[in-house]
Regions:
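N-terminal secretory signal peptides that target proteins for export/translocation
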Residues: 1-3
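Bacterial N-terminal signal peptides
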Residues: 8-18
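A generic structural motif
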Residues: 11, 109-112
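Sec/Tat signal peptide C-region and signal peptidase I cleavage site
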Residues: 19-23
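C-terminal partner/receptor-binding element of secreted or periplasmic proteins
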Residues: 24-47, 114-153
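Mature extracytoplasmic domains of secretory-pathway proteins
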Residues: 51-110
């Protein structure tokens, strides 16, 4: 049975577009470096966790995943990260997404209407210090407000 894309929930539709076929699935999310952040959202190890973590904000997350941004990068040979920003700038509308390939954990920051809308993990939990520099490039003020700690092994 075929389903029109308009019938799918927004985040599910975005993830379906981003997901490569099983034959194309990279063995590691690190192989996605150089692609837009939307590719990370469609990776098998990330998509389910992202869907669950975004909860009631799935539409907002789906919209932000489509925003333009620099190619994804890799930090410490285990984190792949990227972001997308509204043409007005990341301080207005944007999304930062990172994935720790060693612990299979996502890090997500969503900005809506100039304010942070979603933090995964929560704002009070420490983020890996390896992500401090990429976060400063995405949104310096939010990076300054976060707490960073050494990445767990």
């Amino acid at each position: 049975m075929w389903c029109r894309p308009a019938v799918l929930p927004p985040l599910a539709a975005v993830l379906a577009l981003a997901a490569p076929s099983a034959a194309q699935e990279p063995t590691s999310a690190l192989a996605l470096a150089g692609q837009p952040v939307l590719a990370l959202a469609g990776h098998a190890a990330v998509s389910g966790v992202l869907r669950q973590a975004s909860g009631g904000r799935r539409r907002i997350v789906a919209e932000r995943l489509r925003l333009p941004g620099p190619p994804m990068g890799v930090a410490a040979d285990r984190f792949v990260y990227g972001w997308g920003c509204d043409p007005r700038g990341c301080r207005e509308e944007g999304l930062f997404l990172a994935f720790d390939t060693a612990r299979e954990r996502i890090y997500l920051l969503v900005v809506e209407d100039g304010a942070p809308n979603l933090f995964v993990p929560p704002r009070t939990a420490p983020w890996p210090e390896t992500l401090a520099e990429p976060l400063r490039a995405f949104h310096p003020a939010l990076a300054a407000a976060l707490r960073f700690a050494p990445a767990e092994p």
